[in-house]
Amino acid sequence: KVQIYADVAIGVSNILKKYDLLNAYEYATALKEYNGISFADDEMEAYKNGSKGIDWQNLMLQTGISQDYKLGISGGTAKNKYLISANVLNMTAMTITTKYQRAQLRINLDNELTKWLTLSTKINASRTHSHNGGIDIMNFLNYSPTMEMKDPVTGVYNMDPYNSVNGNPYGARVA
């Protein structure tokens, strides 16, 4: 008897609560008050009206989605049995730097050649692709909201000039 099965699972993940962080204007004001770092008046105005500055949480966080698809067929006779199944998994995390994909194929064949001899074949194949930019949430939460994202001349992602030794988290995102 032939049996066919299919299964689909979809999942969604989201951060429950974002951190209450300083915006670019508040951060620039704090740098000026506590470290004596001064910004030009037009720059401060741009931070204040929101036309300049980086909201790292809005930039780096997304809704994570998981999609898992399974399909299989099995059957046979009393002496010959088979099972063939396939699985595709696609996951994007809550951070834009992380993604995981996997495809699997499985084949099982059992053939009873005699009462005392059965030939079994089992084949498993899998292909996996993962991207983890090495960025945890604290990396981008500590990045300055007042920095320029890229060097305008080279196009290279800038490092935070004030308080992080880690690379620019946006540069590690999944393309």
Enumerate the language-model features and the residues they cover:
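C-terminal beta-signal and adjacent terminal beta-strands/loops
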Residues: 58-60
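Structured alpha-helical segments in the cores of large, soluble enzyme domains
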Residues: 69-75
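Short hydrophobic/aromatic-rich motifs at helix boundaries and adjacent loops
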Residues: 40-44, 76-81
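Surface-exposed loop/interface segments of Gram-negative outer-membrane beta-barrel transport/assembly proteins
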Residues: 3-53, 63, 93-100, 104, ...
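A beta-strand signature from Gram-negative outer-membrane beta-barrel systems
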Residues: 1-5, 66-68, 81, 87-89
